[in-house]
Amino acid sequence: SDDILVLNAKDLKGLDYKMSKCCNPVFGDDVFGFVTRTDGIKIHRMSCPNAARLLEMYPYRIQRVRWADTPTSGTFQASLRVITSIEPFIINQIMDVVNTFRTTMRQFNVNENQRNGTYDISMKLSVPSNMELDKVISQIKTLKNIVKVVRQ
């Protein structure tokens, strides 16, 4: 059907939907809904690793969705992976960037890879929208010694 579910960060009365954990969609992402058997509608990013399989194998369980016109006061979880050369203060610099924006750090893990001289950093952030997340990503990319920044 052509019914489009309109999403915002607050719960809709009577409609059970959740942001999918595999791709953590945030306000403004290209998304679709997948009607699960037992867990309501799960919202996935179009770029989700599972998206192609779900769209191909279960087209009858796909729900078209779009975001409300403006973000609500809620926040969304987002995961980033940052690869950087091992340098003094680089972790502080990354933290400073995150704190510059309307984001909250939820988790921050650093694995040191001495063999290739890099830090492999994974972090979880609460963000109001993908626009704010994009600002964080592009600002981290401007730091010296950053090898790669990807959203997970």
What name fits each language-model region?
Residues 1-91, 102, 106-116, 123-124, ...:
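N-terminal non-catalytic structural scaffold regions of very large proteins
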